From Swiss-Prot:
<feature type="short sequence motif" description="EAR">
    <location>
        <begin position="871"/>
        <end position="875"/>
    </location>
</feature>
<dbReference type="Pfam" id="PF23569">
    <property type="entry name" value="NBD_SMAX1"/>
</dbReference>
<dbReference type="InterPro" id="IPR004176">
    <property type="entry name" value="Clp_R_dom"/>
</dbReference>
<dbReference type="InterPro" id="IPR051650">
    <property type="entry name" value="SL_signaling_regulator"/>
</dbReference>
<feature type="region of interest" description="Repeat 2">
    <location>
        <begin position="116"/>
        <end position="199"/>
    </location>
</feature>
<dbReference type="InterPro" id="IPR027417">
    <property type="entry name" value="P-loop_NTPase"/>
</dbReference>
<dbReference type="GO" id="GO:0010233">
    <property type="term" value="P:phloem transport"/>
</dbReference>
<feature type="domain" description="Clp R">
    <location>
        <begin position="8"/>
        <end position="199"/>
    </location>
</feature>
<dbReference type="GO" id="GO:0033500">
    <property type="term" value="P:carbohydrate homeostasis"/>
</dbReference>
<comment type="function">
    <text>May function in a transcriptional corepressor complex.</text>
</comment>
<dbReference type="Pfam" id="PF02861">
    <property type="entry name" value="Clp_N"/>
</dbReference>
<protein>
    <recommendedName>
        <fullName>Protein SMAX1-LIKE 5</fullName>
    </recommendedName>
</protein>
<keyword id="KW-0804">Transcription</keyword>
<comment type="subunit">
    <text>Interacts probably with TPL/TPR in an EAR-motif dependent manner.</text>
</comment>
<feature type="region of interest" description="Repeat 1">
    <location>
        <begin position="12"/>
        <end position="102"/>
    </location>
</feature>
<dbReference type="InterPro" id="IPR036628">
    <property type="entry name" value="Clp_N_dom_sf"/>
</dbReference>
<keyword id="KW-0677">Repeat</keyword>
């Protein structure tokens, strides 16, 4: 039986165990569930004197082959090989990117310590096997008596150099090193050389060099032999057990004094971490206390979810204790948590969203009315972003639906922040503030920028970058002090981790080092900025001081923006770093070149033209985070990428505006993307009509792409599906439900003050893009049709291009067999058949055949008697006259109107896009609701007794699409009331009750007043008929 007690103590030396300890800390800080060889390799590279780092430098082609790592020569070599720190920095960045790609576990779900990955267990076993084989050979060479040799199994402690070699054998580590320009085989050879040379220059292979009086080689060899541990029983030997909890406690309880790997820098590293944490906290407070800008809501952006959550928790604690409140303005500030899981937020109903917003508003207002400040903490912003899926065209698109709870939540939170911070001129309101704060990874924040409109605009967010580690927190760039173009050569010898913020800001803000093209664009934007500022105030209130602080800050921001944009865009081909052919394309700067940063556009899978639409995102620890990109796709606001303008002298110049697309978008690809998004939205909204939805989407997008009006006619009995089509099109094509104009010609203006023709004329003059849903177009009058015909025939708007507004017209027609007057209702009856004791129960199909037409006959008789006495003016008369022929008894005016009506209605026949949407006959939820309501009155019995109940399929079809709220109330107030009457009047609780459809009749003949139940076509009562 394995004891497992010596799992770590008997397999790893102190140095190797210390490396795994720090790897565990790194994995836990990043929120990873397992410790992989990538964590170990990143930890080994974190020390400047580590064995792996020295081996990487030695394996580089530019390294001198005659050089040995003597302690006295190490510093001298560092100054004469400037490219080696850059190469190691690049390698650290590659490992950091690889770690960012590993899956993370959310904070609430992350319990306990990370476990050992299978790849790391295999690496430890390889290291143990190599170490044991080497020690056996050494022992055999030192033994003088062969007969004393033992064949027992030896368990040895794994040295650090063997651990490094085994880690380099891992495929994932080798792949990352190859991407950074290193050869793992060459590095392994250098590790072996370094371990041998350390015998002559020091007693350690980890960079901690000993004095000249260090033991000789024979003494060290003797010490290595004494490290061997013999077991009496070979079964007692134990390999690495990843599930054994002792290794975790061993790492966590190990003191810093037992860490020779980072012994020289452990105290300073801890102090540096504390100092950086204080700087990060101060950056967040500075964002909260901003006064000259609207972006006062910080979002903590980091590479680890657990780390950012811990950072916010520390910020909450310090704010409550008042430890970081310097000016007193953040006193009595309380956090209000308001966040959801990504899955829960996607499937919320409108009622749930409104309830949550109401509770949030109540909490915030209770704090502000009592003179306190509030910070709405939204947690990880991943729940605010829609899911992005790949479509068939190779691009990406967001999932659209008829109602988006995410958009609703985001908009309501933005409105709440604006209302609370803009509370009028009340003096008490000026001291009350409401902020919103969240956390996000770099990928999540980029997706928040890709929203339309972006979350940064809606919530006035300002990102603050908080890397999880000082050494490995490279974010997306190598932090360097070489930001200006012509820095002195003294700066080249500075540490790459050192950073002079004031010097960089001074250089970037005051020196405009751009190409002529970008300088022209800067001048143009600066002029427009000054012009906009002059328009805000009258002349007697404008500041005549050219060096005013606000204007100076704006100009400095423009210079900084254009410097970085020009440096990123135009100088990538001319400025090559000493990296050589670095696969990632990340230049890291030198004494004469400026460092650059890369964005996360590649990781999101965007196309080149989509990448160019966004300028580079720069996350820096020292100056919080500056996001300088615009991921908006509004082509009407941004126009083309290259714009022609005229300067003051009248010369025509070509300028490149920041934030606009650098390449002309492919119209075909863009149309395909929009078409796929619209098809997906329509199929999700009306899943039973997938083929028709695709045809509708294709016809609409064909006209939209040509910047023409879209005209379609939808016939059929599925009124609900027609309305869903209009709502989905308005949201997917024009981006909002507010662009939908609904005109129901059956109402004839009774419910609304304005007539349909007046409403249509007003909306046609609206400059905004509109989707018209016109129901029952066959009931339109001549004036209404004249307006539509004039719009349909108007071609000047397309030719001249004066009016770029587009409109989509969705015209619907009801089936002639299903045309319902607004005063018509369904007639529903209950057929009750008592079960005779001596007869068998008949099948329900026989009952429907024999007794299913009683109500229809009654309806027909009522209709015939009603029609014989009255003339229903609501019934559309059939056109029996010959088309174009005028009645001889009509006046000339009547003839002209009829001729005009005929000519205006002819345009309907010219609309080619026609579709039919009929309701399916599948029983829906209405039948289940009816059965459930029936069983509340007549419960089922186990022994075959009780009342049998069925619903006619025709009735289920007619009830399809009724509003659930009205239908539920009808079931309780009308249907169940009728059932109680049947139950009280029945002699026995047996028999068959069938709910049948009795046709559609006029409500006047039905005797029910104006309209059916709650203005629906449901009857106010259910007729009951008994059959013996």
């Amino acid at each position: 039986m394995r004891t497992g007690g010596y799992t770590i103590q008997q397999t790893l030396t102190t140095e190797a165990a210390s490396v795994l300890k720090h790897s565990l800390t790194l994995a836990r800080r990043r929120g990873h569930a397992q410790v992989t060889p990538l964590h170990v390799a990143a930890t080994l590279l974190s020390s400047r004197t580590s064995l792996l780092r020295r081996a990487c430098i030695k394996s580089h082609p530019g390294f001198s082959t005659n050089y040995q790592f003597a302690p006295s020569r190490l510093q001298h070599h560092h100054h004469h090989n400037q490219n080696h720190p850059l190469q190691c920095r690049a390698l650290e960045l590659c490992f950091n990117v690889a770690l960012n790609r590993l899956p993370t576990v959310p904070g609430p779900m992350f319990h306990g310590q990370p476990s050992l990955a299978n790849a790391l267990v295999a690496a430890l076993k390889r290291a143990q096997a190599h170490q044991r084989r080497g020690c056996i050979e050494q022992q055999q060479q030192t033994q003088t008596h062969p007969q004393t040799q033992q064949t027992q199994l030896l368990a040895v402690k794994v040295e650090l150099e063997q651990l490094v070699i085994s880690i380099l054998d891992d495929p994932s580590v080798s792949r990352v090193m190859r991407e950074a320009g290193f050869n793992s085989t060459a590095v392994k050879s250098c590790v072996e050389d370094c371990s041998v040379s350390s015998v002559f220059y020091g007693g350690s292979a980890v960079g901690v060099f000993s004095s000249p009086n260090s033991p000789d080689q024979q003494q060290q060899h003797h010490n290595s032999i004494n490290r061997l541990h013999h077991y009496q029983n070979p079964k007692d030997f134990n390999f690495i057990n990843p599930n054994f909890p002792l290794w975790q406690t061993h790492f966590l309880n190990q003191s810093p004094d037992q860490n020779p790997l980072l012994l020289s820098s452990s105290a300073s590293h801890h102090h540096q971490q504390q100092r950086l944490r204080e700087i990060d906290l101060k950056l967040v407070v500075d964002v909260l206390m901003r006064k000259k800008t609207k972006k006062k809501n910080p979002v903590i952006v980091g590479d680890s979810i657990s780390f950012t959550e811990g950072f916010v928790s520390e910020l909450m604690a310090k704010l409550e204790r008042g430890e970081i409140d310097q000016t007193g303005e953040l006193k009595q500030t309380h956090f209000v948590k308001f966040h959801f899981s990504p899955m829960a937020s996607k499937f919320m109903r409108r009622e749930d969203v409104e309830l949550n917003i109401k509770e949030l508003r109540k909490k915030v207002l209770s704090l502000t009315t009592s003179g306190k400040n509030a910070i709405i903490f939204t947690g990880d912003l991943k729940w605010t972003v829609k899911e992005i899926t790949n479509n068939n065209s190779g691009g990406i698109n967001e999932i659209s639906s008829s109602y988006s709870p995410l958009d609703h939540l985001v908009e309501e939170i933005g409105k709440l922040i604006t209302e609370c911070n803009d509370d009028g001129d009340d003096d008490d309101c000026k001291t009350r503030k409401v902020w919103v704060m969240g956390t996000a990874s770099f990928q999540t924040y980029m997706r928040c920028q890709m929203r339309q409109p972006s979350l940064e605009t809606l919530w006035a967010l300002h990102p603050v970058s908080v890397p999880s580690s000082a050494n490995l927190g490279l974010s997306l760039h190598a932090t360097s002090g070489h930001e200006a173009r012509n820095m002195s050569t003294v700066n080249a010898t500075k540490s790459l981790s050192g950073y002079d913020k004031a010097e960089e800001e001074e250089t970037i803000s005051h020196v405009l080092s751009c190409c002529p093209e970008c300088v022209t664009s800067f001048d143009r934007e600066a002029k427009s900025l000054k012009a906009n500022q002059d328009k805000l105030l009258p002349s007697w209130l404008q500041s005549h001081d050219a060096d005013s602080s606000s204007q100076k800050d704006e100009l400095m921001g423009l210079k900084r923006k254009w410097n970085r944009f020009c440096e990123t865009l135009h100088n990538q081909t001319g400025q090559l770093s000493m990296m050589g052919n670095y696969p990632y394309g990340l230049p890291y700067g030198s004494s004469h070149e400026s460092s650059k940063s890369t964005s996360l556009i590649d990781s999101l899978g965007l196309k080149p033209n989509q990448r160019a639409t966004n300028s580079i995102a720069k996350f820096r620890r020292q100056n919080s985070c500056t996001i300088e990109f615009d991921l908006g796709g509004n082509e009407h606001e941004k126009g083309e990428s290259i714009n022609e303008a005229e300067d003051d002298k009248g010369n025509e110049t070509v300028t490149l505006d920041l934030g606009r697309s650098l390449f002309r978008s492919d119209s075909v690809t863009d149309t395909r993307l929009k078409l796929s998004a619209l098809v997906k939205a329509l199929e999700e909204s009306i899943p039973r009509q997938t083929v028709t939805m695709r045809l509708i989407a294709e016809s609409l997008m064909d006209c939209v792409s040509k910047k023409k009006d879209s005209w379609i006619i939808i016939e059929g009995r599925d009124t609900t599906a027609k309305r869903r089509v209009a709502r989905t099109v308005s949201e997917s094509v024009f981006g909002s439900f507010e662009s939908l104009v609904h005109i129901d010609l059956k109402k004839k203006g009774n419910e609304s003050k304005a007539s349909p023709a007046t409403l249509l004329a007003y909306e046609l003059k609206n400059p905004e893009k509109v989707v018209f849903l016109i129901e029952d177009i066959d009931l339109a009058d001549s004036r209404f049709l004249k307006l539509l015909a004039d719009r349909f025939e108007d071609k000047r708007r397309i030719k001249t291009g004066i009016d770029h507004r587009q409109a989509i017209f969705i015209l619907t027609k009801e089936d002639s067999r299903n045309v319902r007057n607004r005063d018509s209702v369904l007639q529903i009856g209950l057929e009750i058949t008592a079960q005779s004791p001596g007869k068998k129960r008949k099948p329900e199909s026989d009952l429907s055949i024999e007794n299913g037409f009683w109500m229809k006959k009654e309806v027909c008789s009522r209709q015939s008697s009603f029609n014989s006495s009255y003339l229903d003016l609501n019934i559309k008369a059939e056109d029996e006259e010959v088309e174009g022929e005028i009645s001889p008894i009509s006046s000339d005016l009547t003839g002209e109107e009829e001729t005009e009506f005929s000519s205006s209605s002819n345009f309907l026949n010219r609309i080619q896009n026609r579709f039919v949407l009929n309701r399916s006959c599948e029983p829906g939820i209405e039948k289940g609701m009816i059965t459930a309501a029936f069983r509340e009155i007549f419960p089922e019995r186990e022994e075959g007794g009780g009342v049998r109940f069925s619903v006619e399929d025709k009735l289920v079809e007619e009830l399809y699409g009724i509003q659930n709220g009205a239908f539920e109330r009808w079931l309780k107030e009308v249907f169940q009331t009728g059932l109680l009457t049947v139950k009280k009047g029945g002699k026995k609780d047996t028999g068959v009750i069938r709910m049948v459809f009795g046709g559609i009749v006029d409500n006047k003949g039905y005797g029910g007043g104006v309209g059916g139940y709650m203005a629906t076509f449901l009857p106010n009562k259910v007729q009951v008929s008994k059959f013996e």
